[in-house]
């Protein structure tokens, strides 16, 4: 039998005197509780009504979210110890550290002085809260927290990196320690199958670092940029400034190398691709595509051809060519333009050729170990782009497109390698996400299908369903922004759109993810207003990177 309710217990819907008088309670919620309810409603992000100009300003300002917390809201008070430990334990959040700091400061000020809270928290502060939620950091990366080691190092590979650093001994370049620390902290965010190169990465990184000043400055700029994006410390703004300085220095050094005929084209290509890599993570749209075009001419120079056989291109020395190939394929998709190189590979018929044995992603072959997309799908994506811009009839395009779709659906991928069954399942899921993204790209580029097409909606739902099995913001989820974006482009229901937009943002803290989310908002508004499907490309200058 339940114990009688205490007469001193506060009612859920009213104060005690109101309950005794059996009258409807008109008691007002305390301001602190009302504030918390208002903030808690934003746990599931909803679109913020920003004008296009305001949204563009927000996404293009790299440092604006570093000053979200108003100066008069100091983080003090009795609630300090209650909120931050949970924030530090959470590896992924929609708020980010800055937003949580604002919430904590609100709580502490409310506790000290309820009557004055409205003076401190007004429309401007709530607007900043919305900005923090949409454009601020979404992933809190704490690699040194042993309680979350499975998230930061699911393949338990970091001890091997530490061992290789110890075996190689001190480097002649003391500043290389910054790069070593970068790999120790962010390796699982930087390479998809990072365990496949654990025993080689430090040795190869040292060689690359010592090759040229441009490579040295480019590698350091990326290492510092990752710290600025993920550490969520008071050093965020200085780190970002330092990353910009290193990048600017690398750009100047690269120009000197490009003008120097004694520098090997291979070294020049490595320098350009290091800057392409930095531009990608920094969200530098104009310089990203400019450097990619520079790399295209260098690739043609070192290969003596404009054709790349991605499935058979192998060797440590081909790393920058393979990196270029992936960026070029993604650039063709994002901009709806032909690729800068031609991708010709023989793809065995899946109905005849069955994969036998273990064919894991290999660090000296293909791009799957870097980005997570199976190599055969990367070639088929390039083939789709080539067909899109081919001078053939619509009927011929449709016929060839159906053959590409058959290969996409029937292709067998290499076996995944992972230490745990959970991680193996996650990487199998990632392969299937790329498969459905390739199908949707065919519908967009070749078949010109509408959103309500049954095949389109089936792939959208499959991507949402499979994504629901992956932990947000960590490997392999952090490599899947392109499948999420493509599925979001075709999504019709508000629920599906919200889910996929959130998945894009939750992949990480990089600015290019904010660009993708903003592009989805604009595409949805445009298609809803026009009543039909629009293209995601065609903007000059470009608005996002794949």
Where are these regions (language model features)?
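Aromatic-lined, polymer-binding surfaces characteristic
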Residues: 275
């Amino acid at each position: 039998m339940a114990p009688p309710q205490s007469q001193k217990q506060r009612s859920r819907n009213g104060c005690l005197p109101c309950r005794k008088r059996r009258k409807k309670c008109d008691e007002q919620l305390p301001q602190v509780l009302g504030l918390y309810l208002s903030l808690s409603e934003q746990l599931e992000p909803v679109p913020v009504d920003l004008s296009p100009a305001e949204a563009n300003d927000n996404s293009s300002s790299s440092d604006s979210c570093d000053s979200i917390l108003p100066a008069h809201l100091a983080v003090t008070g009795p609630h300090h110890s209650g909120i931050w430990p949970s924030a530090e334990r959470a590896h992924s959040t929609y708020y980010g550290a800055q937003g949580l700091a604002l919430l904590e400061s609100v709580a502490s000020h409310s506790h000290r002085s309820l009557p004055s809270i409205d003076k401190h928290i007004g429309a401007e502060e709530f607007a900043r809260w919305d900005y923090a939620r949409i454009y601020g950091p979404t992933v809190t990366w704490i690699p040194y927290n042993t309680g979350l080691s499975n998230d930061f190092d699911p393949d338990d590979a970091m001890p091997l990196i530490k061992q290789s650093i110890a075996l190689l001994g001190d480097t002649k370049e003391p500043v290389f320690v910054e790069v070593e620390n970068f790999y120790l902290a962010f390796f699982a965010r930087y390479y998809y199958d990072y365990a496949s190169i654990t025993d080689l990465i430090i040795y190869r990184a040292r060689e690359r670092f010592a090759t040229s000043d441009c490579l040295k400055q480019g590698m350091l700029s990326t290492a510092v940029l990752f710290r600025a994006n993920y550490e969520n410390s008071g050093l965020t703004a200085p780190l970002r400034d330092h990353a910009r300085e290193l990048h600017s220095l690398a750009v100047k050094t690269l120009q000197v190398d490009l003008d120097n005929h004694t520098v090997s084209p291979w070294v020049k290509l490595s320098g350009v691709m290091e800057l392409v890599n930095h531009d990608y993570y920094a969200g530098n749209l104009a310089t990203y595509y400019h450097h990619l075009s520079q790399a295209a001419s260098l690739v043609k120079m070192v290969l003596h051809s404009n054709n790349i056989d991605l499935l058979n291109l192998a060797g440590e020395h081909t790393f920058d060519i393979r990196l270029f190939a992936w960026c070029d394929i993604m650039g063709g998709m994002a901009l709806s333009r032909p690729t800068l190189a031609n991708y010709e590979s023989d793809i065995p018929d899946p109905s005849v050729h069955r994969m036998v044995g273990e064919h894991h992603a290999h660090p000296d072959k293909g791009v799957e170990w870097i980005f997570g997309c199976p190599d055969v799908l990367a070639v088929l994506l390039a083939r789709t782009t080539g067909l899109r811009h081919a001078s053939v009839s619509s009927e011929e395009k449709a016929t060839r497109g159906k053959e590409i779709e058959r290969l996409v659906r029937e292709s067998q991928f290499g076996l995944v390698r992972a230490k745990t069954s959970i991680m193996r399942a996650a990487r199998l899921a990632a392969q299937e996400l790329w498969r459905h993204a390739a199908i949707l790209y065919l519908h967009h580029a070749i078949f010109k299908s509408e959103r309500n097409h049954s095949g389109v909606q089936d792939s959208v739902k499959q991507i949402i369903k499979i994504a629901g099995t992956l932990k947000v913001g960590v490997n392999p989820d952090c490599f899947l922004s392109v499948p999420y974006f493509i599925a979001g482009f075709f999504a019709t229901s508000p629920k599906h759109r919200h889910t996929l937009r959130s998945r894009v943002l939750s992949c990480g803290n990089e600015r290019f993810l904010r660009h993708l989310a903003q592009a989805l908002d604009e595409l949805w508004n445009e298609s809803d207003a026009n009543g039909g499907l629009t293209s995601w490309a065609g903007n000059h200058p470009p608005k996002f990177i794949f």
